């Protein structure tokens, strides 16, 4: 067998092997055996020095033609296997568009936001405006404007996070009231506002305490505002949130920014006032604090306390949610357990 017959035989055998190859691995083996560094066609090229000079160009040309033919067939076979793999994956992963889609999971409002949105809508309906102020407040607006000068002993009740000597994380939203009160034009009508927002106290977090919680404070200032106006407003709030059959009572209390000051209780909705562990067997549950605006608060804002008076109240949105929904641990509000939050989806309607 002369050299040209050998080259032609390698071509025919190579084409036959490529045709019978079943996968890419077999194609790679054929390529290495024929055209690799030690492949048979490569060895022929390496032996050119032993070939007669007049035959070298023809042998080289013949070997390169065979290499090109084999490489073309290898590429086509490789592409065939690749297309087969793609087709198989498409078949395995295809989607039947006629099948029903997965049902979307609806989110739900946070229980505190449910209470907040409900109360905001309720107060707006009664002519109040909603005001939101800064969470980083000044000592002046948080305390001094609220009849709590720097030497006032009641400051010890606040357990404040101070940033520096003048700035702090607000312990109450009363600063919003002070800012609005000193700018309000009473020639255009009375002042009626609520101020919701986050407040901060230096409390250790446990089942009933949190260093951050949410409040809503209300303020009404006008001529001839009486304690009866306050009592009626508080009763409407309690019945709106906790049910029309709730009974209410006011107890004397003390707050530096109101005089007189009261705390409001509602009849226990667990035992209907008969006495149980929730109400500590008193039949009553404390829900908020309130009172008639202290004359010093009015004067600090530039309002003549001999002409104008008013009432203020403050309620904890967290506490309202705890009482209304029977939540036992305040930490549930901020641990982001979807199972806990999903319980309140029906309350949004």
From Swiss-Prot:
Pfam families: Phe_tRNA-synt_N, tRNA-synt_2d. Mg(2+) binds at residue 259. Its main location: cytoplasm. Its EC number is 6.1.1.20. The keyword Aminoacyl-tRNA synthetase applies. This is Phenylalanine--tRNA ligase alpha subunit. Keywords: Aminoacyl-tRNA synthetase, ATP-binding, Cytoplasm, Ligase, Magnesium, Metal-binding, Nucleotide-binding, Protein biosynthesis. The gene is pheS. One of its GO terms (cellular component) is cytoplasm. Binds 2 magnesium ions per tetramer. It catalyses: tRNA(Phe) + L-phenylalanine + ATP = L-phenylalanyl-tRNA(Phe) + AMP + diphosphate + H(+). It comes from the Bacteria. Its cofactor is Mg(2+). One of its GO terms (biological process) is phenylalanyl-tRNA aminoacylation. GO terms for molecular function: ATP binding; catalytic activity, acting on a protein; magnesium ion binding; phenylalanine-tRNA ligase activity; transferase activity; tRNA binding. SUPFAM superfamilies: Class II aaRS and biotin synthetases (SSF55681), tRNA-binding arm (SSF46589). The keyword Transcription does not apply. InterPro entries: aa-tRNA-synth_II (IPR006195), aa-tRNA-synth_II/BPL/LPL (IPR045864), Phe-tRNA-synth_IIc_asu (IPR004529), Phe-tRNA_ligase_II_N (IPR004188), Phe_tRNA_ligase_alpha1_bac (IPR022911), Phenylalanyl-tRNA_Synthase (IPR002319), tRNA-bd_arm (IPR010978).
């Amino acid at each position: 067998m002369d050299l040209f017959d050998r080259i032609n035989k390698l071509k025919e055998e190579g084409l036959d092997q490529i045709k019978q190859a079943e996968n890419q691995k077999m194609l790679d083996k054929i390529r290495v055996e024929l055209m690799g560094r030690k492949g048979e066609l490569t060895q022929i090229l390496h032996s050119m020095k032993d070939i007669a000079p007049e035959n070298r160009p023809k042998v080289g040309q013949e070997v390169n033609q065979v290499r090109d033919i084999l490489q073309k067939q290898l590429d086509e076979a490789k592409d065939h296997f690749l297309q087969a793999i793609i087709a198989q994956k498409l078949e395995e992963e295809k989607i039947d568009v006629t099948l029903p889609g997965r049902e979307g999971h609806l989110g739900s409002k946070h229980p505190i936001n449910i209470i907040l949105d409900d109360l905001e809508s309720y107060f707006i309906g009664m002519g109040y405006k909603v005001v939101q102020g800064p969470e980083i407040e000044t000592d002046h607006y948080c305390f001094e404007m609220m009849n709590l000068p720097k030497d006032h002993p009641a400051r010890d009740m606040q357990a404040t996070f101070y940033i520096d000597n003048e700035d702090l994380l607000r312990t109450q939203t009363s600063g919003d009231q002070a800012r609005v009160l000193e700018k309000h034009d009473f020639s255009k009508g009375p002042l009626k506002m609520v101020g919701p927002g986050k407040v901060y106290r230096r409390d250790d977090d446990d089942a009933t305490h949190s260093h951050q919680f949410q409040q809503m404070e209300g303020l009404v200032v006008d001529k001839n505002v009486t304690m009866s106006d306050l009592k009626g407003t508080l009763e409407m709030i309690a019945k709106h949130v906790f049910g029309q059959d709730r009974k209410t009572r006011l107890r004397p209390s003390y707050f530096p920014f109101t005089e007189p000051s009261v705390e409001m209780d509602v009849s226990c909705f667990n035992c209907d006032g008969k006495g149980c562990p929730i109400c500590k067997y008193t039949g009553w549950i404390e829900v908020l604090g309130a009172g008639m605006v202290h004359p010093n608060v009015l004067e600090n804002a530039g309002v003549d306390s001999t002409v104008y008076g008013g009432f203020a109240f403050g309620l904890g949105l967290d506490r309202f949610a705890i009482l209304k929904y029977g939540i036992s641990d305040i930490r549930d509000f901020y641990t982001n357990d979807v199972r806990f939050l999903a319980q309140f989806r029906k309350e949004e309607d």
